Amino acid sequence: MQDLIGTFGGTLLEPVGRQITVAMMTRNEERAVGKVIGDIQRAVPDAEIVIVDSSSDRTAEIAQSLGAKVIKQFPPRGYGPAMDKALRSSGREVVVTLDCDDTYPVEFIEPMARMVLEDGNDLVDGSRLAGKPAAMPWINFLANWGFAGLASLAFFYRVRDLHSGMRAYRKSLIDRLSYDMNGAALPVELLLRPIREGYKVKIITIPYRPRIGESTMRPLQSAWWTLKRIYRSRFV
C-alpha cells in the first residue's frame, strides 16, 4: 500500500499520488511518451496525468491507451496556451509540470509535491543549473545562466533556472495568479511573478538527462520572449 503523507493541519491525508496532477505539453513525442507515462505511473501510481497535445503523430493515441487524460489543442496554439490549459485542467492540490522527452527525473515528482503539501511552499522549482548538465548544449547553458543572472538582479532574488520544465505548483496559486498565457517562455513568468508577489518559492537542484526525440524550441524566439517576460513580471 502506498505511504500516506501523515497529518497536515490535524487531518489524515489521502495517499500523496491522489493529490497530484502531472501536466505535460506534447508535440510529436511518440518516441518518448510511452516510456515517460510508464515511469510516472510507477513513481506515483495514483497521480492524474494530463496532456495537452498538438501532435501530428501518434502521441495522443499512445498516451490515451496508457490512461492519460489527453486534451487536443486547438487555436490559440503554442506553448503558453497549452501550458495554461494543462495547469488549469487539474482538479488536484498540486500540479507538477514535466517535459515529455525523458529529460526530467520522475522520481522527484513525489518529493517536490510533498514540499508543497507538507512544507507550505506554493511553488517548488527544479533547477537544472547547479553546474552545466552534460545533456544541455553549451549555448543553451550560457543563455539560461545569463537570463537567470539578469532576473536575479531585477528581482533581488537568487534565480537559478528560468526555463525549467519541472516544477510543482500549488493549484490555488495557479487559480490566483495573473499572467499572460500567450507567447513562448511562459515558465519564466510563472516563476518570477510568484516571487514578486511574495509567495513561498523553494528552489532545488535536479538532474537533467539527454532527450528522446528532436527539440522544437526556436532559440531566437525563446530569447526574445524570455526578456519580454522578465520585464513584464517585474514592471507590469
Q: Which residues does each predicted region cover?
A:
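Hydrophobic helical membrane-anchoring modules
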Residues: 1-20, 31, 154-157, 179-236
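Acceptor/aglycone-binding surface of glycosyltransferases and processive sugar-polymer synthases
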Residues: 71-89, 106-184, 210-231, 235
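Hydrophobic/aromatic residues located in beta-strands of well-ordered beta-sheets
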Residues: 22, 48-49, 123, 201
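Active-site beta-to-alpha loop of glycosyltransferases that engages the nucleotide-sugar donor
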Residues: 24-35, 58
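Short aromatic/hydrophobic "clamp" motif used to bind/position activated sugar donors
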Residues: 95
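The conserved acidic donor/metal-binding loop of glycosyltransferases
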Residues: 99-104
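Short, acidic, metal-binding catalytic loop of nucleotide-sugar glycosyltransferases
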Residues: 38-47
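A conserved acidic beta->alpha catalytic loop
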Residues: 53-60
